[in-house]
UniProtKB/Swiss-Prot annotation:
Residue spans, topological domain Virion surface: 1-20, 73-77
Cellular localisation: Virion membrane; Host Golgi apparatus membrane
Primary location group: virion
Functional note: Component of the viral envelope that plays a central role in virus morphogenesis and assembly via its interactions with other viral proteins.
Positions in the Intravirion compartment: 42-51, 99-225
Protein's organism: Avian infectious bronchitis virus (strain Beaudette) (IBV)
Pfam families assigned: CoV_M
Record's protein name: Membrane protein
Bilayer topology term: Multi-pass membrane protein
Gene Ontology cellular component annotations, sorted alphabetically: host cell Golgi membrane; membrane; viral envelope; virion membrane
GO molecular function, one term: structural constituent of virion
Top-rank taxon, per record: Viruses
Length: 225
């Protein structure tokens, strides 16, 4: 009979393996902690992009581990649990792509594939430029500001513009809805009276429909910049 090799690690081998790779494990966990804790669109777009890549990798990694668990189950109960968890992971991953593609068709923004949220804010400036930004939910009020000639919304840098470039309506899109916000108040000028230096706009949620942003674009340069 052929010799069978036992590939199971005993306690001492496990400790030795951990000692050899503990520095790598520490560095890897520290990297994940920094990315997940400090990866915000309002702080650093580079770290936020790395965070998105890490989150995107979690689902395929989870599915791969689930397939391995199904291939090498510890027992019958473990096989059933592995199948259920793997199917759930696959359905969740497919559902994410379906919702993201639907949102992309509505607003034509790569923010649609943001795994942290299911909504994208869009401001169609009167000069034809479209500014998209990540938003976690659909709020009742949005307050974009212009500071030193730069437009910000939800704390995110969007574009250089003038107060006159802000439209009457802005939008927050979800996979199945387009939420329309109407400008209800506008404050311009700072303490020095410079109206181009600082401006605050208040938009209140006005209505909801199923339209796409393309249907409200009129002239100007490319809508999807």
């Amino acid at each position: 009979m052929p010799n069978e090799t036992n590939c199971t690690l005993d306690f001492e081998q496990s400790v030795q393996l951990f000692k050899e790779y503990n520095l790598f494990i520490t560095a890897f966990l520290l990297f994940l902690t920094i990315i997940l804790q400090y990866g915000y669109a309002t702080r650093s777009k580079v770290i936020y992009t790395l965070k998105m890549i890490v989150l995107w990798c979690f689902w395929p990694l989870n599915i791969a581990v689930g397939v391995i668990s199904c291939t090498y189950p510890p027992n019958t109960g473990g096989l059933v649990a592995a199948i259920i968890l793997t199917v759930f992971a696959c359905l969740s991953f497919v559902g994410y792509w379906i919702q993201s593609i639907r949102l992309f068709k509505r607003c034509r923004s790569w923010w649609s594939f943001n795994p942290e949220s299911n909504a994208v804010g869009s401001i169609l400036l009167t000069n034809g430029q479209q500014c998209n930004f990540a938003i976690e939910s659909v709020p009742m009020v949005l307050s974009p500001i212009i500071k030193n000639g730069v437009l910000y919304c939800e704390g995110q840098w969007l574009a250089k513009c003038e107060p006159d470039h802000l439209p009457k309506d802005i939008f927050v899109c979800t996979p199945d809805r387009r939420n329309i916000y109407r400008m209800v108040q506008k404050y311009t000028g700072d303490q020095s009276g410079n109206k181009k230096r600082f401006a605050t706009f208040v938009y209140a949620k006005q209505s909801v429909d199923t339209g796409e942003l393309e249907s409200v674009a009129t002239g100007g340069s490319s809508l999807y910049t």
